[in-house]
């Protein structure tokens, strides 16, 4: 099953406020906000990706969860076919630098250069800096436990990519 952190607030005031902002942003963009959550590579540990998918759904994002052991080609194809606004990758195998490079190359090939991509995993600070330099919009690690805060971050990354002003933290 999927473990939800003890500090989860999926039905509290903060989550309700985030849900309203997700809905408002969808209206501004003319369609509901969609996130693709994927686990590229051979890593089979899916708890973090599933927690993000569940929390995203709880605050109003449409979630496309493609599962584990995906190729970068499968991720890019799904992003194109599903019309997602942002991709969230979960990489715990240590291959995050190589995987991101390949995912970006595949996104470019299908015409999705510039689509925001975030990544989560056990990522050293030095690698997080490199990932951001290479175009990753945000890096999350196990110490990032504020799920509502992550959802606001994701919402604002989508807003920024679509030339909308950021929302205030809920």
Task: Indicate where each model-derived feature is located.
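Domain-level signal for soluble alpha/beta catalytic cores
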Residues: 1-170
């Amino acid at each position: 099953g999927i473990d939800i952190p003890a500090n989860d607030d999926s039905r509290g005031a903060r989550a309700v406020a985030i849900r309203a902002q997700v809905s408002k942003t969808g209206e501004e963009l003319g369609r509901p906000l969609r996130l693709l959550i994927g686990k590229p590579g051979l890593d089979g540990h899916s708890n973090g990706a599933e927690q993000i998918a569940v929390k995203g759904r709880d605050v109003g994002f449409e979630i496309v969860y493609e599962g584990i052991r995906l190729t970068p080609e499968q991720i890019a194809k799904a992003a194109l076919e599903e019309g997602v606004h942002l991709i969230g990758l979960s990489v715990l195998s240590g291959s995050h630098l190589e995987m991101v490079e390949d995912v970006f190359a595949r996104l470019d090939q299908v015409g999705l250069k510039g689509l925001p991509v975030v990544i989560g995993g056990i990522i050293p600070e030095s690698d997080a800096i490199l990932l951001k330099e290479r175009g990753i919009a945000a890096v999350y690690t196990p110490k990032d436990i504020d799920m509502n805060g992550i959802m606001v971050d994701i919402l604002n990354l989508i807003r920024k990519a679509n030339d909308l002003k950021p929302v205030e933290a809920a």
